[in-house]
Curated annotation (Swiss-Prot):
Disulfide bonds: C30-C60, C50-C78, C85-C104, C91-C103, C105-C110
Stretch forming the signal peptide: 1-19
This protein's encoding gene: ACVR2A
Organism for this UniProt entry: Gallus gallus (Chicken)
Main location: membrane
Annotated protein name in UniProt: Activin receptor type-2A
């Protein structure tokens, strides 16, 4: 009877434990603090929203030091799926005298307060006599407990292996390349030296670095932005992502240990930087505008295209979801290439597109349907959102073009003239959705035949009706035709002038073809 009672009590404990797991609190926000905020160029403190896969748990963490009785916080923020944090409502460090104290917990803002309660060995009292156990019970106990312990260890080890494998792919540098150049060796075998910071963005900073005898770009993500780093790595690793108008991917790495882990993404380096930086410092001629716009449209059209039967597999259609001039880089010959795939979505037949939160991207470039939160979560809807943003980038190019007779404006971001440099979501909704305004297309642009056609193309890209927008492939073809037409018009003007001066009749251009 005693053994049966113990067995029933054990089952009751397991049931209670399962109920506690099912009733766990979800972590949505954590207290954020970074003691090295000046060095890392981040905010010092605040509230950090936690993001992650739906099937993984999110936690808060805190790290601190005890220096002569004075508590110094090192970092606080969101923590990724960690079994050691499961079902902990309070942030408590239990290790005995660690050099750096660490605790994690589950629940909103649960890291606001943190504690140190070292585990103490409890001495069992010996005054009470021990009730002798029946021989059969002892035999079962000594036989089953080791077996169950080994089984638990094996299962836990397998779970940890799977968890680690999914979180950090074991081989992060591509070992196969569908064409030239030949595949690079593992990044770990090459010396990589960071030289200078070139840009900062929502998910990290970009460094110019030296890899052997060539310059590369290194985008460094903090561990909190692992999801963006992993998404960008996965997009670059898809079949068919080697393209002249998509930023060349070199490799990815995890650097550092423990809580000071940084995630690196290594790509080709382009000295001219982003289209934003280039337009701030330079004006463009009509031919330069056409070349930049055409290669940008070609890159986006390739990204949007579903291409089966490639040598290295099936390339799915991909929506960028953060098209803007900052994410268009320029090579030395002004060829555009599209970068930054941290928010990109791939569309594979029979598979979910993954994380499809509606309002993502840069507010200034958000399409009306995104600002309204009225997105149709289908592939074509996401591709049309990219095309709206592309219309704004084409406007930026037009605003700095010297083709028209009028003055060239100082560089401004889309809607900067209407609502300034730091618009809120409400500002964008009011201007774009309710008033249906768009950046101004100058009257003087209409006097140039090519610019007039470009203005028409821009208006069809940012149309309020998403289904009426042009595709990226159509924009590419239009720009090619625009450039050809303006070259013909220019040539005919020259022929007319020469005829008037020399009084020599030239055959019409059609007869010379």
């Amino acid at each position: 009877m005693g053994a049966a009672t113990k067995l029933a009590f054990a089952v009751f404990l397991i049931s209670c434990s399962s109920g506690a797991i099912l009733g766990r609190s979800e972590t949505q926000e954590c207290i954020y603090y970074n003691a090295n905020w000046e060095k890392d160029k981040t905010n010092r403190s605040g509230i950090e929203p936690c993001y992650g896969d739906k099937d993984k748990r999110r936690h808060c963490f805190a790290t601190w030091k005890n220096i002569s009785g004075s508590i110094e916080i090192v970092k606080q923020g969101c923590w990724l799926d960690d079994i050691n944090c499961y079902d902990r409502n309070d942030c408590i460090e239990k290790k005995d005298s660690p050099e750096v104290f660490f605790c994690c917990c589950e629940g909103n803002m649960c890291n606001e307060r943190f504690f140190y309660f070292p585990e103490m060995e409890v001495t069992q009292p010996t005054s009470n006599p021990v009730t002798p156990k029946p021989p059969l019970f002892n035999t079962l106990l000594y036989s089953l407990v080791p077996i169950m312990g080994i089984a638990v260890i094996v299962l836990f080890s397998f779970w940890m292996y799977r968890h680690h494998k999914l979180a950090y792919p074991p081989v992060l540098v591509p070992t196969q390349d569908p064409g030239p150049p030949p595949p690079s060796p593992l990044m770990g075998l090459k010396p990589l030296q960071l030289l200078e910071i070139k840009a900062r963005g929502r998910f990290g900073c970009v460094w110019k670095a030296q890899l052997l005898n060539e310059y590369v770009a290194v985008k460094i993500f903090p561990i909190q932005d692992k999801q963006s780093w992993q998404n960008e790595y996965e997009i670059y690793s898809l079949p068919g992502m080697k393209h002249d108008n998509i930023l060349q991917f070199i490799g990815a790495e995890k650097r550092g240990t423990s809580i000071d882990v940084d995630l690196w993404l290594i790509t080709a380096f382009h000295e001219k930087g982003s289209l934003t930086d280039f337009l701030k410092a330079n004006v463009v001629s009509w031919n330069e505008l056409c070349h930049i716009a055409q290669t940008m449209a070609r890159g986006l059209a390739y990204l949007h295209e579903d291409i089966p039967g490639l040598k290295d597999g099936h390339k799915p259609a991909i929506s960028h979801r953060d098209i803007k001039s900052k994410n268009v880089l320029l090579k030395n010959n002004l060829t555009a290439c599209i970068a930054d795939f941290g928010l990109a979505l791939k569309f594979e037949a029979g598979k979910s597109a993954g994380d499809t939160h509606g309002q993502v991207g840069t507010r200034r470039y958000m399409a009306p349907e995104v600002l309204e939160g009225a997105i149709n979560f289908q592939r074509d809807a996401f591709l049309r959102i990219d095309m709206y943003a592309m219309g704004l980038v084409l406007w930026e190019l037009a605003s700095r073009c010297t083709a028209s007779d009028g003055p060239v404006d100082e560089y401004m971001l889309p809607f900067e003239e209407e609502i300034g440099q730091h618009p809120s979501l409400e500002d964008m909704q009011e201007v774009v959705v309710h008033k249906k305004k768009r950046p101004v297309l100058r009257e003087c642009w209409q006097k140039h035949s090519g610019m007039a056609m470009l203005c028409e193309t821009i208006e069809e890209c940012w149309d309020h009706d998403a289904e009426a927008r042009l595709s990226a492939g159509c924009v590419e073809e239009r720009i090619i035709q625009m450039q050809k037409l303006t070259n013909i018009i220019t040539t005919e003007d020259i022929v007319t002038v020469v005829t008037m001066v020399t009084n020599v009749d030239f055959p019409p251009k059609e007869s010379s073809l």
